[in-house]
Amino acid sequence: MGQKIHPIGFRLGITQKHRSCWFANPKQYPTLLQEDHLIRQYIEKNLSNAGIAQIYIQRKADRIELELRTARPGVVVGRGGRGIEVLRKGLKDLLGEQKQIRINVIEVKQIDAEAALIGEFITQQLERRVAFRRIVRKAITRAQRRGIEGIKIQISGRLNGAEIARSEWSREGRVPLQTLRAEIDYSYKRAQTIYGVLGVKVWIFKGEVIPGNPTEISE
């Protein structure tokens, strides 16, 4: 059932780290989980042109630490750090609590090897009414130049304005979804076209993570 489950959630703690990292008592857990969701929604909406690949959230007492992996850090930081201050103020207004918010911006070096950024590129091209096969071919070519071992792209919906919705996919190389040690990057994006919504899924196989020998515990 490896193809049925979310590829990232399937590998948490093995080849993927948790996107949110904190502990809470059962009464606080739903509130904090909803806060995380609101934070991600706010950042993705207000920094849609910054090429956000991943958002990591950590909580320590009354402090929230955000790590933004982005293709365009200059857009996030802004001139003289003004963009960070605007983002921090917006998040404080959203949460409505006096919490310290620390934002760390990390630049993504290999843009064409990130599933989220490839998905974003495809949705932008689809919304400009470019033929989907040409977009997929271009995205795969760009990704292969970065030395990945495999990529799969699937687009679903009313492709090229067809009356009946369908799914089309293309794959190059290996994408072993059932291998737990395989480092799989996955993203799902939606393109809003004049014919309706198109769903875009991207899987990238970056190689296998071979675990080292376990350290022996001295008695």
From Swiss-Prot:
It is found in: Plastid, Cyanelle. Keywords: Cyanelle, Plastid, Ribonucleoprotein, Ribosomal protein, RNA-binding, rRNA-binding. It comes from the Eukaryota. Residues 39-109 form the KH type-2 domain. One of its GO terms (biological process) is translation. GO terms for molecular function: rRNA binding; structural constituent of ribosome. Part of the 30S ribosomal subunit. Belongs to the universal ribosomal protein uS3 family. This is Small ribosomal subunit protein uS3c. It comes from Cyanophora paradoxa.
